[in-house]
Amino acid sequence: MEDWKPLLDAIGSAGRVSAMTGAGVSTLSGIPDFRGPQGLYKNPDAERIFDIDWFDRDPSVYYRGCRELVYGLGEFSPGPVHLALKRLEDAGRLDGIITQNIDMLHQKAGSSRVWEVHGSPILHHCRRCGAARSFGEVMAMIEANGGAATLGEPYVPRCSCGGAYKPDITFFGESLPEVAFARSQELAANSDVMLVLGTSLTVFPAAGLPRVTLQRGGKLFIVNAQPTPLDDFAAARYSDLAEFAAAVMSAFPAGR
């Protein structure tokens, strides 16, 4: 058992607390890490699946590669870290969440201040006319045409104008969501404590956000199974996310 007292004391006493989450948080819900041994990036077509030029050329590459991973996200439930962060928000001890994940599980857990720096499939937009559809609407279109896991050529949901619907996930060749990243920078700059959870801090520019907290005099508490470039600068370093969640739930009981 790791010593969580320094982290819990900091959460309890800090003026402003934020959290930054990565793939490790969602693997506890059963969602594979894109960069892990069984992840999407082991797919030989990985670079094309999330490439905006490829999507505009042939959107079926994306819908083939992600029909189960992205359009099966509705089957997953929030894990212990998602629920622990919701508990901290309810206790008035968390000002916001910056997430690199696209699975929408923080919102599913009930967290209200979530900034998705790599975007989210919660909305899809037509690449031709810009019309918007919700994740649920696109899912309904996919299910009506064979479902997410159907073998053979994937169904590509299209607008009435003929354009393909693309999720608001940031593809290679696209900029990060402007509003979400600006709000994330503001949150990081104003944090007395940032909890860095389940991310190895290797994907920029998002990985630079904890540095903003450090530069402004804030403290980092890192919980990640693998080393990160900022371990030596953290106030404390831990490895077990499930233990972190249990410690938070114990220290901040519901209703208090």
Protein language model annotation of sequence segments:
Residues 1-256:
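Conserved catalytic core of sirtuin-type NAD+-dependent deacylases
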